[in-house]
Amino acid sequence: MTRLILATRNAGKITELRAILADAGLPHDLVGADAYPHIPDVKETGVTFAENALLKAHALAEATGLPAVADDSGLCVDVLNGAPGIFSARWAGRHGDDQANLDLLLAQIADIADEHRGAHFACAAALALPDGTERVVEGQLKGTLRHAPAGTGGFGYDPILQPEGETRTCAELTAEEKNAISHRGKAFRALVPVVRELLG
């Protein structure tokens, strides 16, 4: 069984990706980057989600000699011309401070009417092999931004995005419900046939 590295140390994301890939029937040994603590984090210097996902996947594949999967994802707000976008995790200045990011974004759009609060989560999922082979696929989840957070599930901006056709935020959905419709779920399900094609 081929070992496949997930290029993240984010425990929430590792759990989510393992569930998505297992549900898609991917028969590979999946481990997070935390299994390789000597490998430094990769600077996300790309200007798109796809570029950042590829940077991370290639760095891990090169460092471990194993196939690596990475994603880059974020929230794109229509009225902010797609921001925070690739800066979603560090929108408030410090990387990974979910509450500060939520608070800042909600303050920035506080006076925006409901009909102009459209947004989507975007995800680029990349597979990189040690020989340099690469593939990228993308997924989106469209919705509307709530005026206040709701729900305790998920992570990041999940408490404020209400998916189209839903009455609940992503943070109010069960993990299974969220994975079925999420940007990350769509991207990684699209990556499964690519993994099968390249790794057998």
Curated annotation (Swiss-Prot):
Pfam families attached to this UniProt entry: Ham1p_like
GO cellular component, one term: cytoplasm
KW Magnesium (keyword) present: yes
Catalytic machinery residues: D72 (proton acceptor)
BP terms from Gene Ontology: nucleoside triphosphate catabolic process; nucleotide metabolic process; purine nucleoside triphosphate catabolic process
InterPro entries the UniProt entry points to: dITP/XTP_pyrophosphatase (IPR020922), ITPase-like_fam (IPR029001), RdgB/HAM1 (IPR002637)
Keyword Magnesium in annotation: yes
Catalytic activity from the UniProt record: XTP + H2O = XMP + diphosphate + H(+); dITP + H2O = dIMP + diphosphate + H(+); ITP + H2O = IMP + diphosphate + H(+)
Binding site for substrate: T8, R9, N10, A11, G12, K13, S73, F155, G156, Y157, D158, K178, H183, R184
Entry EC no(s): 3.6.1.66
Alphabetic keyword roster: Hydrolase, Magnesium, Metal-binding, Nucleotide metabolism, Nucleotide-binding
MF GO annotations: dITP diphosphatase activity; ITP diphosphatase activity; metal ion binding; nucleoside triphosphate diphosphatase activity; nucleotide binding; ribonucleoside triphosphate phosphatase activity; XTP diphosphatase activity
Disulfide-bond pairs as recorded: none
Required cofactor(s): Mg(2+)
Role description: Pyrophosphatase that catalyzes the hydrolysis of nucleoside triphosphates to their monophosphate derivatives, with a high preference for the non-canonical purine nucleotides XTP (xanthosine triphosphate), dITP (deoxyinosine triphosphate) and ITP. Seems to function as a house-cleaning enzyme that removes non-canonical purine nucleotides from the nucleotide pool, thus preventing their incorporation into DNA/RNA and avoiding chromosomal lesions.
Subunit-structure text: Homodimer.
Family affiliation: Belongs to the HAM1 NTPase family.
Protein name stated in the entry: dITP/XTP pyrophosphatase
Species: Streptomyces coelicolor (strain ATCC BAA-471 / A3(2) / M145)
High-level lineage: Bacteria, Bacillati, Actinomycetota, Actinomycetes, Kitasatosporales
